[in-house]
Amino acid sequence: MEDEIRKAAEILAKSKHAVVFTGAGISAESGIPTFRGEDGLWRKYDPEEVASISGFKRNPRAFWEFSMEMKDKLFAEPNPAHYAIAELERMGIVKAVITQNIDMLHQRAGSRRVLELHGSMDKLDCLDCHETYDWSEFVEDFNKGEIPRCRKCGSYYVKPRVVLFGEPLPQRTLFEAIEEAKHCDAFMVVGSSLVVYPAAELPYIAKKAGAKMIIVNAEPTMADPIFDVKIIGKAGEVLPKIVEEVKRLRSEK
């Protein structure tokens, strides 16, 4: 693994425009459960009922009860991998973080340019009267076990700005992510199985454009053949080592 860490660091140290793409695996190390896999949430819950737009419109309570069961996880803390990515941005290497996660841990770790393909929990909208709220306005109610209700019209159809099954990705964010993939010289995937489309197309776009490719994941993926550097391991252990090696390489110049 040390040899692969060195290779990844060499790519990033030379990069003028690196992009990081993250999935559920990076947040799993902060205690947020993944959705797929042996211990994934979809083995316990029916996503059609608790995480689809049709299910939400049919029964918003089911969505919020699912969220309440995970409420301790919704307030997780960034882990060393999030901080390492933010450090690479501060060093001028990483120009954008593209994430499939909705937990805002990248921002809390210090990353400034984060493209959230699946939205986030920070804003909520009433589907009936279109009133907009900050998540902070409902935290107290949520912690008491009460589901959000529109303060203006009384509707229970108050939905966070997350992409549920059956909804399209935010088109502007997706466009920006595609542009980043086209123009980067290094593309690093962290904690993604690369099975959810269209997001999983981004590494292929970057590869076609000539970017050097790095993946850090807990297990192999079907996309591994397109990567120049493949590291199997925990992001929270691997990324800080990559950052330290990047700093060492830069100090030698």
From Swiss-Prot:
Cross-referenced InterPro entries: DHS-like_NAD/FAD-binding_dom, NAD-dep_sirtuin_deacylases, Sirtuin, Sirtuin_cat_small_dom_sf, Sirtuin_class_III, Sirtuin_class_U, Ssirtuin_cat_dom
Cofactor note: Binds 1 zinc ion per subunit.
GO CC term, one of those recorded: cytoplasm
Enzyme class: transferase
All residue ranges annotated as the Deacetylase sirtuin-type domain in the record: 1-252
Organism domain of life: Archaea
CDD domains in the cross-refs: SIR2_Af2 (cd01413)
Residues binding Zn(2+), per UniProt: C126, C129, C150, C153
Enzyme Commission number: 2.3.1.286
Signal peptide coordinates: none
Primary subcellular site in the record, as a coarse category: cytoplasm
Other noteworthy facts: The two SIR2 homologs in this organism, Af1 and Af2, display different substrate specificities in vitro. Af2 can deacetylate histones and peptides corresponding to the C-terminal part of p53 in a NAD-dependent manner.
Protein name, entry field: NAD-dependent protein deacylase 2
Organism: Archaeoglobus fulgidus (strain ATCC 49558 / DSM 4304 / JCM 9628 / NBRC 100126 / VC-16)
Lineage: Archaea, Methanobacteriati, Methanobacteriota, Archaeoglobi, Archaeoglobales
